């Protein structure tokens, strides 16, 4: 069972952080949300250049990291709740941060890890590699009750092609399709209360949409959006009424982000649309709330496959209303709120956690503003 915080979670401002132009974020996550401010021409300018962009940008700015801490106040109390987080494969991404926040609020944590990454993840846990990042606000370590092998691209054993079955990266693992994992969780624990989808993959993400193959496009949609539908299909029967589901999306669902291709923008748009439809269906069928978080850029291992994540981190810092580093914990805290009774009337919503970058319609680092 994850450690409980009897006084709940409360937000507090921590010490100023180093500007992104001096230190780029190096934590890990699944494919991130990047922002929606419009860039022009070359698009990404350094902080030095942007400081001379006229009256739009202040020369003297500080940023503060907002972290959760245990203190007296309105509590996020998830004691007695059980969460399944799909898509945790390391200790620095959004999925991990969400797991920590839920654990800090008292929830029991189960995770689903991509089969080829399972051995490394479990070995790292056993050897204490993640102990520092497992620390909760009360000083205890987050406990993961069980790690399940999972490949959410496949709904049932009948869907798994022979080449995957024969792949040595899947050797030694079993019962890892969505249907099998849901059945195993039911056999192990009976029910869950919180379902988190932290999964995304676009094999052709570096390709423009015009250069994306049908196979690559459909693979992106399958792994990044339909996987959520499949998870909810199979886990809904074992979710307690009043439970919640949370997924992670990206502003490319609404705005053009050159470089985020391969059908990933379409997949995120589908995920947000599905969030609204599933909010109705799961709400009526199981009294389950369905929301998605549109998070800002995070320098994850997966995101680095896109090729320009560090520039997007800097771009976000320069152009967002709040000029501060976006922490994975801030996304985790939002997820804990959405999973809690405090958000009991919120469903079908896309919640932006990006320092406000989604509100911007002008890129302050545009070369045109410096002339």
From Swiss-Prot:
Keyword Signal attributed: no
Principal place of residence: plastid
Short name of one Pfam family: adh_short_C2
GO CC term, one of those recorded: chloroplast
Catalytic activity from the UniProt record: a 2,3-saturated acyl-[ACP] + NAD(+) = a (2E)-enoyl-[ACP] + NADH + H(+)
InterPro entries registered for this protein in UniProt: Enoyl-ACP_Rdtase_NADH (IPR014358), NAD(P)-bd_dom_sf (IPR036291), SDR_fam (IPR002347)
Entry keyword set: Chloroplast, Fatty acid biosynthesis, Fatty acid metabolism, Lipid biosynthesis, Lipid metabolism, NAD, Oxidoreductase, Plastid, Transit peptide
Pathway: Lipid metabolism; fatty acid biosynthesis
Cell compartments where the protein resides: Plastid, Chloroplast
Example GO biological process: fatty acid biosynthetic process
Catalytic class of the enzyme: oxidoreductase
Transit peptide: 1-67
Similarity comment: Belongs to the short-chain dehydrogenases/reductases (SDR) family. FabI subfamily.
Subunit structure: Homotetramer.
Protein name stated in the entry: Enoyl-[acyl-carrier-protein] reductase [NADH] 2, chloroplastic
